[in-house]
Design a protein with these regions (language model features):
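Class I S-adenosyl-L-methionine
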Residues: 178, 182, 186-233
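A short glycine-rich, Lys/Arg-flanked "PGG" loop and its adjoining helix->strand segment in the class I
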Residues: 149-163
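Conserved SAM/SAH-binding beta-strand->alpha-helix loop
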Residues: 89
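Conserved beta-strand/loop positions that form the S-adenosyl-L-methionine
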Residues: 61-63, 86
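Conserved beta-strand signature within the Rossmann-like core of class I S-adenosyl-L-methionine
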Residues: 163-171
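Conserved glycine-rich SAM-binding loop
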Residues: 66
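S-adenosyl-L-methionine
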Residues: 1-61, 69-78, 97-125
């Protein structure tokens, strides 16, 4: 475990930014009112594949899934695996619920709120994958403690991933990329960076769909970077 200063996302205990945007369409509100209660992560208790799905399965955890394209793609690709997606933004949750309905994804559970609240309730060594795709970069230096890639969260990721489990990160912000590489370098006793050549972090690996945000980033001339780390142990 790496010593970390108070003030990173594991100790701030608050979310920054909006939790909702434009008013939901009626069809979206219907999904929030009717489908979300059926598939949301309970507010209390241990969170496991068994507690959520009734049987043990490889468990995936996505932090800040945006509109849910990646979450839905992976869940559809791996129907015998279990997926938890966390997103505080109501409009993103509503869009993701549409993917769950349209793709008929019984292997997805959703948490509208702070991902770390749920992550703490998952037993150590229970996760096969953690995804953090295009997190808020918090570009100002004084806001660096708000970045999800910080020593506290990375220690938490390490405790929840099983040996051989994988942490996947995507960002189009060069500052966030360099910051993440620096933080992860402090955790080489917990994680192995899987890149062997520069191409390995310039293109997504197999089974990794480009989201709308990623496509927008490319159109606007920004290059997404893809990092994969394996849990050592």
């Amino acid at each position: 475990m790496t010593a970390h200063k108070p003030g990173d996302p594991t100790t701030i205990n608050r979310l920054y930014g909006r939790s909702s945007g434009h008013k939901l369409r009626k069809s979206q509100q219907d999904l929030v009112d009717n489908l979300l209660p059926q598939i949301e992560v309970p507010e209390e208790g241990e969170v496991t594949a068994v507690s959520l799905f009734g049987e043990d399965r490889p468990l995936h955890f996505e932090i800040g899934f945006g509109a849910g394209e990646h979450l839905a793609f992976r869940a559809d690709l791996l129907p015998d695996h279990a997926f938890i997606g966390c997103e505080p933004f109501l409009n993103g949750v509503a869009t993701a619920l549409g993917h769950v309905r349209d793709k008929h994804l019984p292997n997805v559970r959703i948490w509208k709120g702070d991902a770390l609240e749920v992550l703490r309730r998952i037993p150590d060594g229970a996760l096969s994958f953690i995804y953090l795709l295009h997190p808020d970069p918090w570009p100002k230096a004084r806001h660096a403690k708000r970045r999800m890639v910080n020593d506290g969260p990375i220690d938490l990721f390490a405790s929840k991933l099983k040996p051989g489990g994988e942490f996947r990160l995507a960002t189009d912000d060069p500052t966030y990329l360099n910051w993440s590489l620096m933080i992860m370098q402090r955790h080489t006793g917990q994680f192995e960076w899987l890149a062997k050549t520069p191409k390995d972090f310039l293109e997504p690996s197999g089974g990794w769909i480009e989201t709308r945000y990623g496509a927008k980033s490319r159109r606007e001339g920004r290059r997404p970077y893809y990092l994969r780390y394996r849990r050592i142990g």
